[in-house]
C-alpha cells in the first residue's frame, strides 16, 4: 500500500515537471512575441513527451577523462533528493507526517548541493567545475537566510510540523504580518533553485551550460527534471508557509483547488521573472545576500523571538 502511495506522489510530480517545461517555453515565447512550441500535438501539448522520448533513447555519452561512478550517481542523486523533499509537504495530508518536517526539508536541500558538486568534479571540465563551485557557494549562502526566515515563521506557528501551518493560518495568511520575510524568502528561493536572474551556475554566455555541460541524453534529463521538481516544490512550500489554505475535512477538494492555484501563480511568477530580468553579476548576488538579506533576516528573527516575550505579560482584553 505504501508503495502505491509513493507512486501516487511521484507520477504526478514527473507529469507536472514535463508540462512545466512546456509552459515555460510557451510563456517565454509569448513574452518575446513568438508562438513557442506548437508543432507536436495540438498547441504543442505533446512536446514534453517527444522531448522525453528523444532524450531517453539517445546514447548517454561520457567524457573519457571523467570519474565514471560519480558521473552516473550525481544525476540519480539529484532527482532522488528532489523527489524526497516532497515527502513531508501537507497537501493537505503528507506522505509521512513528520514531527520535524521543516528540518527534514532543510537537510535534504543541503544534500542537493553534493549532486551538483559531484557532477562538476566528475565531468573533469573547467567549465563544469566553475559552474559547480558557483552553484555550491550560491546554494549554501542562500540556505542561511532560508533557515533564518523559516525559524521566524515557525515562531509564529509554534511547531516544526508543516501541517500545523494550515491551522495557524485559518484566520490570517502569514504573508500579512511577515511580508518582509515573504519577499526575502521568495528571492532566496529563486537563488536556491538557480533560476534567472540568479542562474549564474548555467550562465550560457560564460560557462556554456554550467555543471551539466558534459551531460547528454538520460542523465541530462534527470538533472533537468530535478531542477523543475525543485521549482514546483519550493513554490508549494511558499504557499504552505505564507499563503496557508484553510482545510475543511468535509470538502478536501476545495483545499486542493485553492492550494494548486496559489502554487501555480507562484510558479508563473518564476517564469515571468525569468522573462523580465537580466542576470546578476556574481559579486552582486553575494553582496545582496551577506550585506542586505542576512542582517535584515537576523533583525526580524530577533523581533519575532522578542515579540511573544514582550506581549506575554499583557492581560487578555475582554
UniProtKB/Swiss-Prot annotation:
GO cellular component, one term: mitochondrial inner membrane
Enzyme category, top tier: translocase
Ranges annotated as spanning the membrane: 2-22, 70-90, 100-120, 147-167, 172-192, 222-242, 253-273, 294-314
UniProt record, GO biological process: mitochondrial electron transport, NADH to ubiquinone; mitochondrial respiratory chain complex I assembly
EC number: 7.1.1.2
Keywords: Electron transport, Membrane, Mitochondrion, Mitochondrion inner membrane, NAD, Respiratory chain, Translocase, Transmembrane, Transmembrane helix, Transport, Ubiquinone
Classification via Pfam families: NADHdh
Protein name, per record: NADH-ubiquinone oxidoreductase chain 1
Amino acid at each position: 500500500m505504501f508503495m502505491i502511495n509513493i507512486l501516487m506522489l511521484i507520477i504526478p510530480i514527473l507529469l507536472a515537471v514535463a508540462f512545466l517545461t512546456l509552459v515555460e517555453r510557451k510563456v517565454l515565447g509569448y513574452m518575446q512575441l513568438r508562438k513557442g512550441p506548437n508543432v507536436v500535438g495540438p498547441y504543442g501539448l505533446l512536446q514534453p513527451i517527444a522531448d522525453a522520448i528523444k532524450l531517453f533513447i539517445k546514447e548517454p555519452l561520457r567524457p573519457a577523462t571523467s570519474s565514471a561512478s560519480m558521473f552516473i550517481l550525481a544525476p540519480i542523486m539529484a532527482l532522488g533528493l528532489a523527489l524526497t523533499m516532497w515527502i513531508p509537504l501537507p497537501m493537505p495530508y503528507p506522505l509521512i507526517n513528520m514531527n520535524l518536517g521543516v528540518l527534514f526539508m532543510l537537510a535534504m536541500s543541503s544534500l542537493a548541493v553534493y549532486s551538483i558538486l559531484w557532477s562538476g568534479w566528475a565531468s573533469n571540465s573547467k567549465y563544469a567545475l566553475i559552474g559547480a563551485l558557483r552553484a555550491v557557494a550560491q546554494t549554501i549562502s542562500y540556505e542561511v537566510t532560508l533557515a533564518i526566515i523559516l525559524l521566524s515563521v515557525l515562531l509564529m506557528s509554534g511547531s516544526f510540523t508543516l501541517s500545523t501551518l494550515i491551522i495557524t493560518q485559518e484566520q490570517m495568511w502569514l504573508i500579512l504580518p511577515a511580508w518582509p520575510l515573504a519577499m526575502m524568502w521568495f528571492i532566496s528561493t529563486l537563488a536556491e533553485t538557480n533560476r534567472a536572474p540568479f542562474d549564474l551556475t548555467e550562465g550560457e554566455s560564460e560557462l556554456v551550460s554550467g555543471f551539466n555541460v558534459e551531460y547528454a541524453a538520460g542523465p541530462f534529463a534527470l538533472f533537468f527534471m530535478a531542477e523543475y521538481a525543485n521549482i514546483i516544490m519550493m513554490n508549494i512550500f511558499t504557499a504552505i508557509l505564507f499563503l496557508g489554505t484553510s482545510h475543511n475535512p468535509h470538502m478536501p477538494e476545495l483545499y486542493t483547488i485553492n492550494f494548486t492555484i496559489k502554487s501555480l501563480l507562484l510558479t508563473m511568477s518564476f517564469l515571468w521573472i525569468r522573462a523580465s530580468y537580466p542576470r546578476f553579476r556574481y559579486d552582486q548576488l553575494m553582496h545582496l545576500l551577506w550585506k542586505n538579506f542576512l542582517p535584515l533576516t537576523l533583525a526580524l528573527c530577533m523581533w519575532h523571538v522578542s515579540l511573544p516575550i514582550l506581549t506575554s505579560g499583557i492581560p487578555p482584553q475582554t
